[in-house]
Amino acid sequence: MWWREHRGRILALARLGLVLGAAGLLAGCFEPLYGSNPSVGGGSVRDKLAEVLIPPIPVRQGTPQARIAVELRNALQYDFNGAAGAVAPTHRLDIVVSPTDITVIIDPVSGRPIEEIGALTASYKLVEIATNKTVLTDSTFAHVGYDIPGAQQRFAKERARLNAQDRAVQVAAEAIRNRLASYFVAGT
């Protein structure tokens, strides 16, 4: 019988047809995160993010945490609102940051650290301003490694640490933005 000889081909075509059919059905379920979405009150996620107020992050002035707090707040404000004008806020984002530096590798000859990891943990809660009710509580972290050059380069260690902090802030800001966008789309 001819079908026994071509059984492998027939099964492969049947599998391919099932996969393509399932992909076609699931394509109708796709919804872009930043597109217009009637389930978020008629506006887009970008509009909802623009309505989030980000107050100054509470830290002691003059500390390394103060610089990180300002950078994180600025990154989030730019991500949420860009250069657009002020919008009446519907939510408030309260953030607490705690940065740390962890020595990973020590030079066996000099005993000085040659590589460190800058760790940044940001805990945040989203509060609905009208009811003063916390609707979302979460935290995020970022670990960024950096090399420490030898003793001849006096300011290179500080510059490397600041660059690592800037990268960690961008990672944390992106994670917070994505989590809030997910909240505004799915409500969870």
Locate predicted features.
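A structural "domain/chain start" motif
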Residues: W2-L20, G24-N74, V185-T188
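Short, well-ordered turn and helix-capping elements at secondary-structure junctions
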Residues: E5, P58, F80, P99-D101
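Conserved acidic
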Residues: P64, I68, I114, A160, ...
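N-terminal, post-signal-peptide region of Sec/Tat-exported proteins
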Residues: I68-T90
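Sec/Tat-exported extracytoplasmic proteins
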Residues: D79-A84, E128-A130, A175-F184
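Surface-exposed short loop/turn segments
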Residues: A83-S139, H143-N163
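C-terminal/domain-edge helix-coil "capping" segments
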Residues: Q152-T188
